[in-house]
Amino acid sequence: MNAHVKSAGVAVKVIKKLTPITVSESHLMELTATIGEELAEARDRQAAQYVQGTLEPEVKEPPQAVAVASDGGRVLTRAEEAGRGVHDPAWKESKVACLETLNSQPSEVDPHPELPGCFAEEDVVGKLVREIKSIRKEGDQASNDGDDEGDRISKEAQSLLNSLVLPAESGDDDPSDHELAEVREPKTKTNRKKRRKNKDWRPKRRVRTSVCSMCSSDEFGPKVAAEASRRRFFEAARRAFLGDGLPWNWTLQARWFPDFEPILDFVHPTTYVYEASRVVAGSDAKAWPLCVRWLQACWQGQVSLVLEELRDWQASHPSPPDEKLADTDGRTIVKKALTYLSHNASRMDYPRYRRLGLPVTSSMVESLIKEINYRVKGSEKSWNRPSGCESILQVRNAVLCEDADRLSDYILSRPGSAYYRPSTGKRASEEITAA
């Protein structure tokens, strides 16, 4: 129960209401920590078996199409064994990987060559860019002062991203949902059929599992690869690895998933294209048409055309070698866009990904992080560093995996005794008396 609801306090109330069991918040958190530590140990043993080549798959048949997406979250931590209260608060990055089997069909032609309607709406794209920039700015501020404002803005941006992503990639088949994903049209019967037909090409999620940890990206790689191997992802005919441009994502992909198609989440280059177009166009009236043209080029796999125009502008607006430019300077904005797009150009062949029936956004992992944050983040909520963070991540992750009821199955099958606490070796009756 403590993995499903917002806090241990809520879990205690639910348990009391539904069962004759009485348990304190502190005792429930002790049990959660114990189970979380054991789940982390089991995950690490699985990773070690994969590295040693002894890990056996647990599914009968390999899937046809799969996607792995990784990203980083943020968890507020505190010093461990420092007494009551929050001591030495610090935001730390959690690593999260989402592994999905997909229901999709390859196609000989690009099933959706035109830019989705939402990316042709200036107010929508402008709001998206502002929200993503707010996440970065407020995230840095929160890291310095321990404020949770960054999480509030992140949730707002996530809500917008969810309205922009292709709905079938989130497992949503309702043609009335996420209307921003298509050009706005009257809700006639004909247009409903048209929207449904346009969505048929998008890959649909079948089964999702996930891996999360507070470890480094180097340590995270084998944990994700082990989960993928257990589900026979490496044997799939079509394989995708999605990320948002963070360097560690592509290092992990190159080391542990070299045969997977690396795909840059389409939403993130949109922010660089939007800001650079406002600089290059020279006027507000010309900026938006240029942005749409560049976004269309990226959507059609022609990022080289965008890079060429950016380089031409940069050549005609040189920067003095000894001058430090402000972040708001147009030359700085164009340079950042050039760097980002050139570094990721090889991961932006979106027409080919769509022909293969693969997703082109990393919304799957962004939505997963939001589900994890429901339990892990909140006002005045901090976790012991590092054990408390790792434990709560594991129990929350166990209830979010869709291949089985992982948490219940583990608790019901774990070795142990009703009379002894494994961590202390004391008799349960002695602990009750001492308490």
Each PLM stretch: what is its role?
Residues 1-435:
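Catalytic center-proximal scaffold of phosphoryl-transfer enzymes
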